[in-house]
Amino acid sequence: MVKLVSLHISRSFIQSPLSRNQEWIDLTLDYAISTVTVAGKMSNTHWALRPFKGHFLPETADMSRQFTRARELLRPTLEARLQQRDKVPNDLMQWIINNYPDQEDDLTLHTRLQLEAVQAATYNLAIMQRPLDSSRVVELAEMRQLLEGVAKIEPDRDCERESLCTVTIPTPRWKHSAGWCLRLGTIYDDDSLWTDPTSFDGYRFEKLRTIKGNELKFQYASTSTSELNWGYGTHACPGRHYASNQIKLMIVSLLSRYEFQFDHEQTDKKAIVERPPNVVDGVRIMPNPQTLVMVRSLGNVNEGCE
């Protein structure tokens, strides 16, 4: 999945041949892994020690080395773009050149944007209780429902609200003192807002949109006081629509080629299929790495699971 994300983003952000260069692909993957590893280690470190610890982490040195090599690979492409000017590809690099002439030759900026674009998502396809209708997959209708259900059951735990002053919440009356922090993802566990909030339901928001007045609410990239995965207000993620479309396109590509199931479904077909619990590590929520997801090509279903 991570490689698929890297290939997809690279194609959007910079055209071939660099986007299909194996060394470039490996660099984007390694840089993403190093970044996540550093973030995980730093999240468990006292804030006062983080500036010192960061310099001694081996992954920090790896990131510096990876960034330097990425600059070297990107330089010929950027120089060719600046000289060419005509018949150039329509990608992120060209967009920066066209819209930010003062930074068009900033190799560090271009490299950072390319490397920091890589991101990944989910293994919840295997738990869908009924198959996704192919025509609706093309329309991305059921795809949106799946992703909305995933976003609710796996909220962004690194997003916190800190009170800068004492706040009194009237109903129920509760005083929130200055300096307190609240995990915004906890709103998705509130049973006064959601039915069976801790269970995964890929069609939860489809049902909610059937209620009059909710027809346009609860979209995957929506932001509101009850939908905080992408942030809220001026702090909402500006790239959420691009990211959501990217995820949808990748899953459509996977569903059109493969089918998925958990390994325990194969051994016990009569058992009720349950989604394996997540692994929570600090601010990170991850699929259980010990869970085996079986994949079979739809092109030849007789070959068995791979």
From Swiss-Prot:
Disulfide bonds: none
Binding site for heme: 237
Entry keyword NADP: no
Keyword terms: Heme, Iron, Metal-binding, Monooxygenase, Oxidoreductase
Co-factor(s): heme
Signal peptide extent: none
Record-listed E.C. numbers: 1.-.-.-
EC category: oxidoreductase
GO terms of biological process kind: secondary metabolic process
UniProt xrefs under Pfam families: p450
Molecular-function annotations in GO: heme binding; iron ion binding; monooxygenase activity; oxidoreductase activity, acting on paired donors, with incorporation or reduction of molecular oxygen
Pathway membership: Mycotoxin biosynthesis
Cited SUPFAM superfamilies: Cytochrome P450
InterPro entries: Cyt_P450, Cyt_P450_CS, Cyt_P450_E_grp-IV, Cyt_P450_sf
Summary of the function given for this chain in its UniProt record: Cytochrome P450 monooxygenase; part of the gene cluster that mediates the biosynthesis of aspirochlorine (or antibiotic A30641), an unusual halogenated spiro compound with distinctive antifungal properties due to selective inhibition of protein biosynthesis, and which is also active against bacteria, viruses, and murine tumor cells. The non-ribosomal peptide synthetase (NRPS) aclP is responsible the formation of the diketopiperazine (DKP) core from the condensation of 2 phenylalanine residues.
Record-stated family: Belongs to the cytochrome P450 family.
PANTHER family xrefs: CYTOCHROME P450 (PTHR46206)
Entry protein name: Cytochrome P450 monooxygenase aclO
Organism of origin: Aspergillus oryzae (strain ATCC 42149 / RIB 40) (Yellow koji mold)
